[in-house]
Amino acid sequence: MQEESSKELYSKAVKLIPGGVNSPVRACRNVGCEPVFIESAKGAYLTTVDGQELLDFVLSWGAIILGHTNSTVTNAIKKAASNGTTFGAPCKAEVLLAKEIIDAFPGMDMIRMVSSGTEATMSALRLARGVTGRNKVLKFIGCYHGHADPFLASAGSGVATLSIPGTPGVPEVTVRDTLLAPYNDLSTVKDLFVMYGKDLAAVFVEPIAANMGLIPPKEGFLKGLRALCDAHGTLLIMDEVITGFRVAYGGAQTRFDITPDLTTLGKIIGGGLPIGAYGGKAKYMEHIAPLGEIYQAGTLSGNPLVMTAGFETLQLLKDINYTILEKQVATFANELEVILKDKGVPVQVSNFASMFTVFFTNNELKSFDDVKTTNTQLYSILFRSMQKNNIFLVPSPFETNMVSFAHKEKEFEKALIAAKKIMFNITDVN
């Protein structure tokens, strides 16, 4: 078969697939270029169809933490596949993975596997509405909980209270019960509880916001949400699709000592294969069919390949010291910030655990409104220059870069050397 370049493949793809990609951000339009097509991946690196080896800080949007094609995980997948790729019936691996996840999260008694993070959040919302008999849900502006209609809401009129559809195709009635508040703004949340508390089924929150770049929670924010939910009989749902098993083995909730009513998971728990899950206290989870009255199902839920990959991944993570990688990332982020500041640009590199975001601003960042004021043109220059020098960052100024346990000192040094080669024009800075 004749080899084709990324450019040739993309020109074909745009005629066959909307935008040439199967998830919008991959098109790289936010950074002013076309996507590269990947041939293979190993450890901390991707290899494009053009033969370029890229140091990977995307890591399949956080789904990879051990490094690409970890031999233990891939060998387990091969063995599982030899016994059948899907059964449509229960298998041993789903029991093993379920127990592993439940043991990692102190407040979780039961878990249900699905095939994506969107399915997990959609199902958790349905469960919350079902057990409370309420319809309204509160989410935070800039936080992403998948593409189910109730979560695709934009801020409407009022003090971050009323919603309008965030995309065509979502009826206004669908987001009418979605309330919005700025992330880290507990005061607005309190006001919303005063107005709508008796109708509020759930509060959804990313414990560390990672879809508006990386914005950690302010001290007291998460505990304040827990207290408000307790006072009003509202379920607190932590979306740990990104942070679960990334910031700690038991997720962000163990870092911040917060026990939610329900938790949504994805990415890492699938070992690089498609997965989602939602779990929590038995008194809620027992309402899910066939045990209870709230329906949710899936043809490939509990797929044996995915369950095997996830279980093997978590087995390896149990014996890994997260603190070492966290310190390495913090050092790298600080050094990267110094390099970029020396080029005369306003910049800060936010980091937490094995995640970081380069924000081109000197302003304090605590919500999506703050993030929107950053210089996205400078980020586009950063992305293109780094990719030219074999470093693959997230192709959007509002996403979060990821680091794996396969990233060692030489990888961080390689990225810093590439950053030193970036040239910014004064017109871009202004």
Curated annotation (Swiss-Prot):
The enzyme's E.C. designation: 5.4.3.8
Cofactor(s) the protein requires to work: pyridoxal 5'-phosphate
Catalytic reactions of this protein: (S)-4-amino-5-oxopentanoate = 5-aminolevulinate
Listed InterPro entries: 4pyrrol_synth_GluAld_NH2Trfase (IPR004639), Aminotrans_3 (IPR005814), Aminotrans_3_PPA_site (IPR049704), PyrdxlP-dep_Trfase (IPR015424), PyrdxlP-dep_Trfase_major (IPR015421), PyrdxlP-dep_Trfase_small (IPR015422)
Gene3D superfamilies: Aspartate Aminotransferase, domain 1 (3.90.1150.10), Type I PLP-dependent aspartate aminotransferase-like (Major domain) (3.40.640.10)
Any one annotated GO CC term: cytoplasm
Keywords: Cytoplasm, Isomerase, Porphyrin biosynthesis, Pyridoxal phosphate
Enzyme class: isomerase
N6-(pyridoxal phosphate)lysine PTM sites in chain numbering: 267
Family assignment from sequence similarity: Belongs to the class-III pyridoxal-phosphate-dependent aminotransferase family. HemL subfamily.
Complex and partners: Homodimer.
Name the record gives this protein: Glutamate-1-semialdehyde 2,1-aminomutase
